[in-house]
Amino acid sequence: MTAQNIDGTLISQTVRSEVAARVKARVAAGLRAPGLAVVLVGEDPASQVYVGSKRRACEEVGFVSKSFDLPASTSEEELLALIDELNNDAEIDGILVQLPLPAGIDSTHVLESIHPEKDVDGFHPYNVGRLAQRIPKLRSCTPKGIITLLERYNIALRGKHAVIVGASNIVGRPMTLELLLAGCTTTTCHRFTKDLEGHVRQADVLVVAVGKPNFIPGEWVKEGAIVVDVGINRLESGKLIGDVEYNKARERASFITPVPGGVGPMTVASLIENTMLACEQYHTK
């Protein structure tokens, strides 16, 4: 068996086109375009790249993108004051604070200060709690994007055993909640998990998000499994690879996300969808 690649680049473009059409219809009806505020603190090169891609995506679909680039010396109080201002700005539907934040700033405190109805990253405890209660609104972008990918490929999830490797607040934990909501039986593995191989070998759906190149050997993948590789690791050669040994895993899986071009593009597409949703459901007067 050779797995079919799940094309995140293609699906993300489709999602963006759908959102662009909704924006066009709003503006034609005399309503304002959705607004996203993107806050970057400091000059971390990777963060600058990510923020740039998010801003471009916003502009492509017709959003109003407002940029706030703050120096690394910014205090937590100054950042919280800006967020408070944006929370009260009627033309801003979403607030995105790029992580990581410089040392000395409590990221949990900052993320919790964003109004839940403008939390388009889906990190606020209120929004994670809604997902846990099976009434999601603004969902964490990467897990939401993964579910969108699987849905667009008509991959049925109900009744499958899903194994999530990695338990971060950004991917692993909300991914577990998403797959529970989709009707999977879920196992979440982390640094204290015993017999990781045994768990992985049982997975009908395998989601790996640990940030370690080729962490999961391809031979561990169950025949016919659906493999979602969230990892993006740059080797010294400059090549990007995932957390799963792709070539060997592809020989055993039925579907697999490549790196790059799999999950990555969907994170930004989900951010765009969330901003549209926030505008339509919460802020349209």
Curated annotation (Swiss-Prot):
Quaternary context: Homodimer.
Record's function text: Catalyzes the oxidation of 5,10-methylenetetrahydrofolate to 5,10-methenyltetrahydrofolate and then the hydrolysis of 5,10-methenyltetrahydrofolate to 10-formyltetrahydrofolate.
PROSITE patterns tied to this protein: THF_DHG_CYH_1, THF_DHG_CYH_2
Keyword vocabulary terms for this entry: Amino-acid biosynthesis, Histidine biosynthesis, Hydrolase, Methionine biosynthesis, Multifunctional enzyme, NADP, One-carbon metabolism, Oxidoreductase, Purine biosynthesis
Name the UniProt record assigns to this protein: Bifunctional protein FolD
Organism: Vibrio vulnificus (strain YJ016)
EC number from the UniProt entry: 1.5.1.5, 3.5.4.9
Keyword 4Fe-4S assigned: no
Entry similarity comment: Belongs to the tetrahydrofolate dehydrogenase/cyclohydrolase family.
Top-level taxon of origin: Bacteria
Xref: HAMAP family: THF_DHG_CYH
GO biological process: L-histidine biosynthetic process; methionine biosynthetic process; purine nucleotide biosynthetic process; tetrahydrofolate interconversion
Cited InterPro entries: Aminoacid_DH-like_N_sf (IPR046346), NAD(P)-bd_dom_sf (IPR036291), THF_DH/CycHdrlase (IPR000672), THF_DH/CycHdrlase_cat_dom (IPR020630), THF_DH/CycHdrlase_CS (IPR020867), THF_DH/CycHdrlase_NAD-bd_dom (IPR020631)
